[in-house]
Amino acid sequence: MAVKIRLARHGAKKRPFYRIVVTDSESPRDGRFIEIVGTYNPVAEPAQIDLKDERIKHWMESGALPTHTVRNILKNQGFFSEAPQEA
C-alpha cells in the first residue's frame, strides 16, 4: 500500500476548503482516508493553513509522500529544511 499526503476537497461550489489527509494512493480524491493532518482554506485572505506537524513528520518518516501541491504548502510554512521527495 503506497501512502500519500494530499488534498481532499470540501466546501461549496466556488468556495473550496481542503483537508490535508493521509490516504492510500489508490483511494479517490475525496474518498476514504487514514488520518486528517491539516486544513487549507485558499478563499480566506490570507489563506488559512492549519497543520499537525508531529503527525505529518510521523507519516513522512513512515514512507508517506506528499503530492506536489501539499509539498509546496508545507515548504511555504517552513516545514522542510531541504526539498522532500515528491509522490
Curated annotation (Swiss-Prot):
GO terms for molecular function: structural constituent of ribosome. Belongs to the bacterial ribosomal protein bS16 family. The keyword Ribonucleoprotein applies. PROSITE patterns: RIBOSOMAL_S16 (PS00732). One of its GO terms (cellular component) is cytoplasm. The keyword Signal does not apply. Gene3D superfamilies: 3.30.1320.10. Keywords: Ribonucleoprotein, Ribosomal protein. GO terms for biological process: translation. This is Small ribosomal subunit protein bS16. It comes from Desulfatibacillum aliphaticivorans.
